[in-house]
Amino acid sequence: MGKGASVASVKVGKTGFETRKNIPGNIKEIKPSLLMSVPALAKNFRKNIEKNISAKGPVIEKLFNHALKLSYSYNKEGINKGKGLQILKKPLLFLYDKILFSKIREGFGGKIDFFIGGGALLDIELQRFFYAIGMPMFQGYGLTEAAPIISGNALERHKLGSSGFLVQNLELKICDENGNKLPVGKKGEIIVKGDNVMVGYWKNEEATKSTLKNGWLYTGDMGYMDHDGFLYVLGRFKSLLISDDGEKYSPEGIEEAFTDQSPYIDQCMLYNNQNPYTVVLIVPDKEAINRKLKEENQ
């Protein structure tokens, strides 16, 4: 923990906690170079950005969407940014950044180098959006039991959609339900070993034995390693849904896709217990629906 830091905000003997509505103003005032965020807050940032762009009229909105599309194709997954003929798009992207994206960044203080996303799986579409406007949002992975960083992306080496590359002096393997090591690209439980892994749970020998085996920490998370050395975390290994043909899949990514693709869905939850079909419980975004109905009735 030689490079770690702990920061607390204390005022008049009390710990301060900000409300969400004040966060945008605080960011603009402080002008941070690094911002740590959870996906829910980042999604709220994106909604506000798109809302402000839409309010400027159809011409600006169309120009912004074209700039996003161009930036997406240029950036790709980050690791292959601007490769080959994509480099020809750079002059136009520079112009778009000057007249559009830089103005958005000013709303965040104008100095942010990148976001760090944590607390939950970060949707790749959200990463592409912030990457396009010049404020990359990188995902990492860690556990308290691993003190806590296991992997992370960095400005000089990153791949959108991944949880990054492993920290130094850490071993990782992907295993099946029986503890057998799987090859690169195969999905299984993420298991790690290294000096940063805990000795055990305080006064809980039973939990320690089930989590630590021969020095290996069984995280309970499902994922895989790709051929470029990046880790992909897919969800909790024990929360997998099972269809009637025995296929197992993680619900988190599908649930994220539902809420990301429709502005009228607030939350959703998938369920399947060895049935031939999967059901989903959807909670509508009443405010968004009412707003759309008012627009249609005008």
Predicted regions and their residues:
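P-loop NTPase motor core
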Residues: 13-52
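Conserved ATP-binding/catalytic segment of the ANL
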Residues: 166, 173-175, 180-185, 191-243
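Core-facing hydrophobic residues within beta-strands of well-ordered domains
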Residues: 112, 167-170, 265
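ATP-dependent adenylate-forming carboxylate-activation enzymes
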Residues: 5-29, 58-59, 249-254
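Alpha-helix/helix-capping structural signal
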Residues: 40, 120-121, 196, 287
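AMP-binding/adenylate-forming catalytic core of the ANL superfamily
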Residues: 194, 199-200, 222-298
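Gly/Ser/Thr-rich phosphate-binding loop
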Residues: 5, 33-36, 47-158, 263
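Short catalytic-loop micro-motif centered on adjacent basic/acidic residues
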Residues: 8-10, 115-117, 242-243
